[in-house]
Amino acid sequence: MKSAFKSEFPFEKRKAESERIVQKFHNRIPVICERGGKSDIPDIDKRKYLVPGDLTVGQFVYVIRKRIKLPAEKAIFIFVNDTLPPTAALMSSIYQHHKDKDGFLYVSYSSENTFGGAGPLLEK
């Protein structure tokens, strides 16, 4: 899925912003979170996050769920590079292995597991 954030801002601007963020907030990770293509979950009110490195993927999902006011009975899945990251993985580890060339970690969310299952996200 093509990121709307990437479409809106040129690479140089995104890279400069992520470098500034990482320099200013050493223990934070710059994350762009956008709704996946055909999801019926509402759009999120903001897509840029500064996430603590010691936050787990499961805790990040909780934050996203709260931001979009998703009822408990509705499922939500998040994807990094079209793969489900392990719930217990630290965001710092996911960032280390999967950050974009511009320095941001791109995460998409959906109401369906559209990519079929968890993959080897931490093996590289």
Curated annotation (Swiss-Prot):
Signal peptide (UniProt feature, chain positions) = none
PTMs?
Answer: The C-terminal 8 residues of ATG8 are removed by ATG4 to expose Gly-116 at the C-terminus. This Gly-116 forms then a thioester bond with the 'Cys-550' of ATG7 (E1-like activating enzyme) before being transferred to the 'Cys-244' of ATG3 (the specific E2 conjugating enzyme), in order to be finally amidated with phosphatidylethanolamine. This lipid modification anchors ATG8 to membranes and can be reversed by ATG4, releasing soluble ATG8.
Alphabetical UniProt keywords:
Autophagy, Cytoplasmic vesicle, Lipoprotein, Membrane, Protein transport, Transport, Vacuole
Query: Main site of residence?
Result: membrane
Lipidation feature positions (Phosphatidylethanolamine amidated glycine): G116
Alphabetical list of Gene3D superfamilies matching this protein: Phosphatidylinositol 3-kinase Catalytic Subunit, Chain A, domain 1 (3.10.20.90)
The protein's superkingdom reads Eukaryota
Task: Specify the propeptide location in this chain.
Answer: 117-124
Location(s) in or outside the cell: Cytoplasmic vesicle, Cvt vesicle membrane; Cytoplasmic vesicle, Autophagosome membrane; Vacuole membrane
A Pfam family the protein falls into: ATG8
Q: How does it sit in the membrane?
A: Lipid-anchor
Query: In a knockout, what does one observe?
Result: Blocks autophagic activity by impairing the formation of autophagic bodies.
Q: Looking at the UniProt record for this protein, which Gene Ontology cellular component terms does it annotate, in alphabetical order?
A: autophagosome membrane; Cvt vesicle membrane
- The site feature described as Cleavage is recorded at G116, G117
One GO BP: autophagy
PANTHER family referenced in this protein's UniProt entry, alphabetically:
MICROTUBULE-ASSOCIATED PROTEINS 1A/1B LIGHT CHAIN 3-RELATED
Into which family does the record put it? Answer: Belongs to the ATG8 family.
- What function does the entry list? Ubiquitin-like modifier involved in cytoplasm to vacuole transport (Cvt) vesicles and autophagosome formation. With ATG4, mediates the delivery of the vesicles and autophagosomes to the vacuole via the microtubule cytoskeleton. Required for selective autophagic degradation of the nucleus (nucleophagy) as well as for mitophagy which contributes to regulate mitochondrial quantity and quality by eliminating the mitochondria to a basal level to fulfill cellular energy requirements and preventing excess ROS production.
Q: What else is known?
A: Kluyveromyces marxianus proteins are shorter in length and have a more ordered secondary structure than their S.cerevisiae counterparts, which might contribute to the superior thermotolerance and solubility. K.marxianus could be therefore useful as a new model organism for further elucidation of the molecular details of autophagy.
Description of how the protein assembles with itself and partners: Conjugation to phosphatidylethanolamine (PE) leads to homodimerization. Interacts with ATG1, ATG3, ATG4, ATG7 and ATG12.
Q: What is this protein called?
A: Autophagy-related protein 8
Which species is this record about? Kluyveromyces marxianus (strain DMKU3-1042 / BCC 29191 / NBRC 104275) (Yeast)
Q: Which gene encodes it?
A: ATG8
